[in-house]
Amino acid sequence: MRCVPVFIILLLLSPSAPSVDAHPKTKDDVPLASFHDDAKRTLQRLWQNTWCCRDHLRCCG
């Protein structure tokens, strides 16, 4: 039972680890990569605003 909290913490940390692309980006991949970067940035901003607004109403904007 002592391993369960450690396993949960490791499970939560694993998605935040940086990912490495196996294939180098080509000219055709650049628009798709920038789209993914924009989507990721937008989701991160929405996630931060959600947690911020839950804790501190002043920081919502």
From Swiss-Prot:
InterPro entries: T-conotoxin. Keywords: Amidation, Cleavage on pair of basic residues, Disulfide bond, G-protein coupled receptor impairing toxin, Secreted, Signal, Toxin. Residues 1-22 form the signal peptide. The keyword Signal applies. Residues 23-44 form a propeptide. The modification Cysteine amide is found at C60. One of its GO terms (molecular function) is toxin activity. Belongs to the conotoxin T superfamily. This is Conotoxin LiC32. The lineage of its organism: Eukaryota, Metazoa, Spiralia, Lophotrochozoa, Mollusca.
